[in-house]
Amino acid sequence: MAMKVDLILVLLNSLFNIQACTGQGRIERGKIDVAEHIKKEASVPLDTSINGIILDDTVSLNNILGKRLPVIDFSNYGECTVCSNIDGTEILILCVNYGGYINQYDKFVVVPSHSIIQPKRIRQTLLKKFCSGLGAYIGCDIKEIEKQMMMMNKVQYKTAEGVEIVYSQSLPDWPYHCEYHFMNNRLIRYEFDCRDP
């Protein structure tokens, strides 16, 4: 009889372990569901790609832009690769990940081509526009993407051209930072990076 009770207890314990590992069964009161906890803690989705090119990922970049991209030393950005869209109206600056692999970049900046001094070596792409993973693109209306930015820090500046609104976010436990600059409710610049401070 004692052996049957022990066997039943072992089987019940195994069943509870299987349910815990597969996520089946009820969550007891007072215990934390990790997936739900992460969803609650992340204030906004993170923007980490432009046209499928992912921060710090060499494979996605090689598939979209090619294996060897020219690296230049460009103004305030350091070593980077500068790309333009097909008609040359937008510039994508890919900043080199120091200590990383070839074609590994840890900062992306997108600006209109008229807003910066153009470097001599620009890689022209076949992309019509540079669009981020969350739908941001140069010239988009603030209303198109403000839902993703509701929990970000917001700062307004008065300039000669009008009011500039900057949404930004930094994560305390991960080296990630993003900024979206709007002038007259239109996106004029955006950038994100995953660099250690």
Describe every region a protein language model picked out.
Residues 165-166:
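Conserved phosphate-binding/catalytic loops and adjacent sensor/switch elements of nucleotide-binding enzymes
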Residues 1-28:
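Bacterial Sec-dependent N-terminal signal peptides
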Residues 22-161, 171-174, 182-197:
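Short helix/turn-capping signatures at newly exposed starts of structured segments
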Residues 179:
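Conserved catalytic or metal-liganding residues and their short signature motifs at active sites
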